[in-house]
Amino acid sequence: MKADIHPVYEAITATCSCGNVIETRSTLAKPLSLDVCNECHPFYTGKQKTLDVGGRVDKFKSRFGAFGATKKA
């Protein structure tokens, strides 16, 4: 391998928009700003909203279910 071709892997601080500061290591070599982190992301805070409006199969059956029905004489 060639010597001195790899970037320096240094400790940096990543600051979230909520104010949380995370110490990590990177080759970026400058402070990093984040939009979300584990302290403010809705999935990790329990404030996630789930939208259950019916699946694709239910929608398909409601639109095309009558086409496969047999007719009574």
From Swiss-Prot:
Q: Which cofactor does it need?
A: Zn(2+)
Q: Which UniProt keywords apply?
A: Metal-binding, Ribonucleoprotein, Ribosomal protein, RNA-binding, rRNA-binding, Zinc
Cite the binding residues for Zn(2+): C16, C18, C37, C40
One function term, GO molecular function aspect: structural constituent of ribosome
Task: Enumerate the Gene3D superfamilies for this protein.
Answer: Ribosomal protein L31 (4.10.830.30)
A Pfam family the protein falls into:
Ribosomal_L31
A cellular component term (GO) from this record? Answer: ribosome
Describe how the cofactor binds. Answer: Binds 1 zinc ion per subunit.
What's a GO biological-process term for it? translation
Q: What does this protein do?
A: Binds the 23S rRNA.
Subunit structure, as described in the record: Part of the 50S ribosomal subunit.
Similarity comment text for this entry: Belongs to the bacterial ribosomal protein bL31 family. Type A subfamily.
Q: What is the protein's given name?
A: Large ribosomal subunit protein bL31
**Source organism of this protein record:** Pseudomonas fluorescens (strain ATCC BAA-477 / NRRL B-23932 / Pf-5)
